[in-house]
Curated annotation (Swiss-Prot):
GO molecular function: transferase activity
Gene: phaG
Name of protein: (R)-3-hydroxydecanoyl-ACP:CoA transacylase
InterPro entries: AB_hydrolase_1, AB_hydrolase_fold, Carboxylesterase_BioH
Purpose: Catalyzes the transfer of the acyl moiety from in vitro synthesized 3-hydroxydecanoyl-CoA to acyl carrier protein.
Enzymatic class: transferase
One family name in Pfam for this protein: Abhydrolase_1
Coiled-coil region list: none
Keywords of this entry: Transferase
Species per Swiss-Prot/TrEMBL record: Pseudomonas putida (strain ATCC 47054 / DSM 6125 / CFBP 8728 / NCIMB 11950 / KT2440)
Pathway recorded for this protein: Polyester biosynthesis; polyhydroxyalkanoate biosynthesis
EC number per UniProt: 2.4.1.-
Gene3D superfamilies: alpha/beta hydrolase
Length: 295
């Protein structure tokens, strides 16, 4: 399953690496939005869950992954800017659906508040309108380690917290990925954490009141950081919100085990294609280079 690769110019300011997994029989296209500093490799399992029922689009933010060499990294990028990049990609690919993971949910909600004309449904996974105590501790420690450029501590942070339920092989890839990032990527992550702690999430929630499409919020039963109970508070902000719980899953959902993978896939397809029963996809273990890092 080889994607069509393109590097797109976004309003003359950024160049964004994209992968388009075309499915000839698919009628709809979905864009996947990852957490900060995660790359297209993080969505390998999700692509297998959604393709070939959908055309699937992956992309790297200008500061990360395969977009990184195409941009000068002269300035930090806000969640609002990420939202505008997403809107450009939605327009370019004429995407019918979007799906976000973890803190990719902030830019996704900001983009959906603009009511993009093509998008009919959205899935927001492992995200919460509440920064609870475990998440605040995670963000505070992340801010401290990133400011000090402490690669060892940054490399272990995700595995010890939101990634605690991941298979050991995923954790090794996470550590290798995070501890080898460029200094500008650490600065970008530090900037995003400060945005969150300085009420950037509140701005996203205020805009969410403008969202006029169905949005499914998916959270793991074992996730202490974006809990099922906290996620349900999205009903106060998103008018057409729905909620699903993935049993035996933590923050990383379909990456964690076979049962969670199958349950996540069934929930996603049940929401996005409710009239169609799809054949079950086989769960495939992590491949070389795949990581689960997100913030």
């Amino acid at each position: 399953m080889r994607p069509e690769i393109a590097v797109l110019d976004i309003q003359g300011q950024y160049r964004v690496y994209t992968e388009f997994y075309r499915a000839d029989a698919a009628e709809n296209t979905i864009i996947l939005i990852n957490g900060s500093l995660a790359t297209t490799a993080s969505f390998a399992q999700t692509v297998r869950n959604l393709h070939p029922q959908f055309n699937v689009v992956l992309f790297d933010q200008p500061y990360s992954g395969k977009s990184k060499p195409h941009n000068r990294q002269e300035r930090l990028i806000s969640k609002e800017t990420e939202a505008h990049i997403l809107l450009e990609l939605i327009e370019h690919f004429q995407a019918d659906h979007v799906m976000s993971f973890s803190w990719g949910g902030a830019s996704t909600l900001l983009a959906l508040a603009h009511q993009p004309r093509y998008v009919k449904k959205a899935v927001v996974s492992s995200f919460s309108p509440v920064i609870n105590e475990p998440m605040r501790d995670y963000l505070d420690r992340g801010c401290q380690y990133l400011a000090a450029c402490d690669r060892y501590q940054v490399g272990n942070l995700v595995n010890d917290t939101i990634g605690k339920h991941l298979p050991s092989l995923f954790k090794r890839f996470n550590y290798r990925h995070v501890s080898s990032l460029d200094s500008h990527e650490y600065a970008q992550m530090h900037f995003h954490i400060n945005q969150v702690l300085e009420h950037d999430l509140e701005r996203a929630l205020q805009g969410a009141r403008n969202i006029n499409i169905p949005v499914l919020f998916i959270n793991g039963e074992r996730d202490e950081y974006t809990t099922v109970e906290d996620a349900r508070q999205f009903s106060k902000h998103v008018g057409r919100s729905q909620f699903s719980v993935i049993r035996d899953a933590g923050h990383f959902l379909d990456m964690e085990n076979k049962t969670a993978c199958e349950n996540t896939r069934n929930v996603m397809l049940g929401f996005l294609k409710p009239t169609v029963r799809e054949p079950r996809q086989r769960y495939q273990p992590v491949q070389q280079g795949q990581h689960a890092f997100a913030i």
